């Protein structure tokens, strides 16, 4: 009788050692896979500082993304190499006109700062 118990224990341990141990790391059906993770809401605190933003692509299509700054809309930059030469020149002229307006609007700073009055503070004194 003890021999039968000993053999059954050896057989049981041998079968257990031969089979891989079940690990429930990313194998359970209720865990999120790549399809489910992209369709569900974010449940992590690590994404708490990301804000929903509407991303506008170059072709005009829009996508809702999460961005680190709270903005309503974020436009992708336009590829100037893809434009025709006429469109490129028109954009350049429009941009130059805006820059000239900004230069003209710069107010002249009236300064009444007297350097001689404060010269004593930046000259080194001998000790």
Curated annotation (Swiss-Prot):
Question: A cellular component term (GO) from this record?
Answer: mitochondrial inner membrane
A Pfam family that the UniProt record links to this protein: Mitoc_L55
List every position bearing Phosphoserine: 84
What does the record list as GO biological process?
mitochondrial translation; translation
GO terms of molecular function: structural constituent of ribosome
Q: Where is the transit peptide?
A: 1-32
Q: Which domain of life is it from?
A: Eukaryota
For this UniProt record, give its keywords in alphabetical order, as a comma-separated list: Mitochondrion, Phosphoprotein, Ribonucleoprotein, Ribosomal protein, Transit peptide
Listed transmembrane segments:
none
**Compartments, record wording:** Mitochondrion
What Gene3D superfamilies does the entry give? Mitochondrial ribosomal protein L55 (6.20.130.20)
Q: Which PANTHER family match?
A: 39S RIBOSOMAL PROTEIN L55, MITOCHONDRIAL, LARGE RIBOSOMAL SUBUNIT PROTEIN ML55
Q: How the protein assembles, per its UniProt entry? A: Component of the mitochondrial ribosome large subunit (39S) which comprises a 16S rRNA and about 50 distinct proteins.
What the record says about family reads:
Belongs to the mitochondrion-specific ribosomal protein mL55 family.
What's this protein's name? Large ribosomal subunit protein mL55
| UniProt gene name | Mrpl55
